[in-house]
Each structure stands twice: as structure tokens, then as C-alpha cells.
Regions:
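Long, well-ordered hydrophobic secondary-structure segments characteristic of membrane-embedded
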Residues: 74-85
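Local sequence-structure signature of Cys/Sec-based thiol-disulfide redox active-site neighborhoods
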Residues: 19-28, 275-278, 366
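Bacterial N-terminal signal peptides that target proteins for export
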Residues: 1-8
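Short, contiguous pre-domain boundary segments
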Residues: 21-29, 104-111
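Hydrophobic h-region of N-terminal signal peptides that target proteins for export
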Residues: 10-19
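Primarily the internal scaffold of c-type cytochrome electron-transfer domains
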Residues: 37-72, 92-161, 170-449
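Loop-rich non-cytosolic ectodomains and luminal regions
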Residues: 166
Length: 449
């Protein structure tokens, strides 16, 4: 019996059936891994990757495509996207590549690998704040001090990976090789990864790329349904510091989602408002390709999650215009600090989007809202949000002025603005309370205001 025939027999005997043609390499992977890691194989079998060849994906109407790369290597076209197709990309730049049963395999699948088929999405993501999330902490001494001195004092690398860097991402590196045992007791050599596991949005991968597609599309089903549901976002965007999910859950939109969401169609592209779903989730407003029932596009798909946002609401002392790109450590305020505002709220003169861009982005977001709401409702909503931001910023400014008195009198040391008791009270004022109030207004969850 040949190995390929053996692989097919394994599928049949175990009740599994590949939904599309497998490459010889992937078939061999599955012949072992359906025993070694059966959950992974079953999850993959439920995926669109297992059911659709690349050629089939490219033959879809452009607006319905989930593949954006135009010139995909021919050898991949006639097969479904399997183990080998993802874990054998760009082997010359993967420091985690190793010889595994006569194949060169990467442990970590990175955005650069996903770009083989999803080039546009990866390019868009590379400009986002999410892609630079780890550097936003590490390369900005102000935020780095907040993490190391205030939020995770006396920490170790593993603790960092479970706290701030669990969401922001770690830098995954290879320490060397190690021996592990299969279920049959066989020994195999695999790379020993540092700062792993991690699926933070700004993870630095062994090939040098930034990001983790599995933050939103968990392996190995890579489901668009999972990515569109708010539970996925809630992994990182929840209270106390980023209470987006909590606010959404208590909003009218969240009420309707919780009550009716099980009846919606989560897999269609484009996603038709009023037909596939009734109220927005995080993905609807921030990145999904949304159309009306006549097929007219309301919002184009984007993986730059800030591209429809004009005001930055969370994580910083004051609300302010969005930064022009994700490399926010390059911002400089009037005091020379890498921040978008001064401690008293004055905006940095460069690096933030201008009023014209703010209007354009607000128009994009309003277009989604206007699919269900009247102009007066939408205008009133955003007017309330702007006033709430101003009120929250004013309260933070009052707290900051009290703190400045402490700094000026020597009661607190201004060298590190985050490590003393009075400073920690000030952090709570903007990181927890002001953030909650801003979010509450943006997403109509009034109890959090």
C-alpha cells in the first residue's frame, strides 16, 4: 500500500473525509496528525481551507472573493489549503524552520505566509496600530515605564506574556532544538521557542513579520464567523482598561445580538445588512465588507482597524485625532515626549490625522450607521459622543493638575509618572474611568458613562 493510499484509508476508517483534493505533502501530514493532534485535524476539516481549492476561490466574483493575491504560485492552485501549504512558506527566512520527516516545516505561520493568498489584507494590517502593538509598548519609554513599573512590577518574561504582551504580542525566537515524544513514544527534534505560545496582535514572528492572523481567525478553522462575533474581540477589549465588549454587551446593539445572533448568517461575503444580520458587531463597524440588499457596497473590507476611526478614545490620557500610522512611538508632543498630547491635553503638532481626514473617516463610519438609522439619529449620536469626550477629558485634566501640584512640590517624583500611589490613582482616572465613559458614548452603553 502506498503512503497516499494509506492516508486515504486512514480518513475512511476514522470517518473523516477531505472536502477537496489534498497535496501529497498535506496528506502525509494528516496521516500522522489525525492520531497525534486529532483536534487540529478535525478543526481544519471544518474550515473553508479544507473545502476549497485556490483555483475555486479565485473564480469567485471579485466582490465575493476571500483571496486577494492575484498571482498565486501555480503548484497551489489545484489543492485545498492544507498543513503543508501553510507550514512550508518562506522557509529561508523562518528561524523556526526544521527538518520534519523529510520536509522543511515552520512551526509558526505568520502574516507573511498568509500573504501568499491574502496579500491585500496583510498589507492593510501592516499599517495598523495592532501590527505594531508590541513596539508601541517597547519603543515608547513612557508606556514601557507604565508596564514595567506600574502594571507588572517584579515581573518575569512569562508573566509579561500573560499580561500586557498577551494581547500586544511577544517576540517569538528560537533558543535551539529540543527533544519531544510522540504518543507512540518516538523521539523527534523540534525548535525550542521562547515567548511562546502567543497570539497577540503585534507578535513578532520568527520570520521577522509582525502580527498574528489567529488573534481573530483562530487556527485551524480560521473562521470568518468567529472573527465577526464580538467574543473574539473581547479577549483583549474588555474591562477594566479597554471595556469595549462590556459596553457593547449592555448596549441596544448588544441586546439584540445576544437575543437574535444565533439566527444570523455569519459566513456570507459581502455581509448584507438587514438580511444576513440585524445589528452591528465590532467587525461590522470596524472592518467588514458590508452591502445592502441591492448589492450596493456600504463599507469596503479593511484589515487596518483604525481606518474608519477619526478619534482615538482609549489607552491614552486624553481623546485625540487618530495617529497617521501604527508607529505611534514616533509622535512627539510639545514637551518632547513620544505621546499624542501633553499631560495637559495639547495635541502634538505632527503625526496625527488632520481635520479633512477626520471628516472622511467619520463619513465612512456614518455610512454604516445610516444603513439602519436616520440622519438626525446618527448626527445626534456623534454629537453626544463628542461632548462626552470633552467632559471626560476635562475631568482628567483636573486630576492631572492636582498631580502636577504634587510633582511641583516634590510630594511625588515626576521622573516616572506612573509608580507612586497618587500617580496610580491618576492612572485609574483616565485608563479605567475616562476610557469607560468614552466607550459608553461611542457604543451607546450609558451605564458605563
Amino acid at each position: 500500500m502506498t503512503l497516499n493510499t494509506f492516508g486515504i484509508s486512514i480518513f475512511m476508517l476514522s470517518g473523516l473525509c477531505a472536502m477537496g483534493p489534498l497535496s501529497d505533502e498535506t496528506e502525509e501530514c494528516i496521516s500522522c496528525h489525525e492520531t497525534e493532534t486529532p483536534g487540529i485535524v478535525q478543526d481544519w476539516l471544518s474550515s473553508r481551507h479544507a473545502k476549497t481549492t485556490v483555483l475555486d476561490a479565485l473564480e469567485k466574483e471579485r466582490v465575493e472573493r476571500r483571496v486577494s493575491t492575484e498571482n498565486i504560485v501555480e503548484k497551489y492552485m489545484e489543492y485545498v489549503v492544507g498543513c503543508y501549504e501553510c507550514h512550508s512558506q518562506n522557509i529561508n527566512v523562518h528561524t523556526d524552520n526544521f527538518e520534519h520527516f523529510d520536509y522543511n516545516i515552520n512551526i509558526v505561520v505568520s502574516p507573511k505566509d498568509c500573504a501568499t493568498c491574502h496579500e491585500t489584507e496583510v498589507d492593510e494590517y501592516s499599517h495598523s496600530k495592532k501590527a505594531h502593538a508590541i513596539d508601541i509598548l517597547i519603543k515608547n519609554p513612557v508606556y514601557s515605564a507604565l508596564v514595567t513599573e506600574s502594571l507588572t512590577p517584579h515581573h518575569g518574561k512569562n508573566i509579561e506574556g500573560e499580561t500586557c504582551y498577551g494581547c500586544h504580542g511577544t517576540e517569538v525566537s528560537v533558543r535551539g532544538m529540543k527533544t519531544i515524544h510522540t504518543k507512540d513514544g518516538d523521539e523527534i527534534e523540534v525548535p525550542d521557542l521562547a515567548n511562546w505560545p502567543n497570539q497577540g496582535v503585534g507578535r513578532i514572528n520568527p520570520d521577522g513579520s509582525k502580527g498574528s492572523c489567529t488573534s481573530c481567525h483562530p487556527r485551524h478553522s480560521f473562521s470568518i464567523e468567529v472573527a465577526r462575533k464580538p467574543y473574539t474581540c473581547s479577549e483583549c477589549h474588555l474591562e477594566p482598561d479597554v471595556p469595549a465588549y462590556n459596553v457593547y454587551k449592555e448596549s441596544k446593539h448588544g441586546n439584540m445580538y445576544m437575543s437574535l445572533g444565533s439566527k444570523w448568517n455569519w459566513n456570507e461575503v459581502p455581509w448584507v445588512i438587514g438580511e444576513d444580520f440585524k445589528t452591528p458587531t465590532c467587525a461590522t463597524c470596524h472592518n467588514s465588507l458590508v452591502a445592502d440588499t441591492e448589492g450596493e457596497i456600504i463599507a469596503t473590507r479593511t484589515h487596518d482597524f483604525g481606518s474608519r476611526l477619526w478619534t482615538r478614545l482609549f489607552g491614552l490620557i486624553y481623546s485625540h485625532p487618530q495617529p497617521k500610522d501604527g508607529q505611534t512611538w514616533n509622535l512627539r508632543n510639545k514637551d518632547g515626549l513620544p505621546m499624542p498630547t501633553t499631560f495637559t491635553g495639547e495635541l502634538a503638532e505632527t503625526g496625527l490625522i488632520d481635520e479633512t481626514e477626520q471628516v472622511a473617516r467619520k463619513s465612512k463610519m456614518s455610512g454604516v450607521c445610516l444603513s439602519c438609522h436616520s440622519t438626525s439619529w446618527v448626527d445626534g449620536h456623534f454629537r453626544q459622543m463628542e461632548e462626552q469626550n470633552q467632559a471626560a477629558d476635562a475631568m482628567v485634566l483636573k486630576a492631572t493638575q492636582h498631580l502636577q501640584k504634587a510633582w511641583n512640590s516634590g510630594v511625588a517624583n515626576a521622573e516616572n509618572p506612573f509608580d507612586e500611589y497618587i500617580e496610580r490613582l491618576w492612572i485609574e482616572q483616565w485608563l479605567f474611568y475616562a476610557n469607560s465613559a468614552r466607550y459608553a458614548s461611542a457604543m451607546s452603553g450609558p451605564d458605563y458613562a
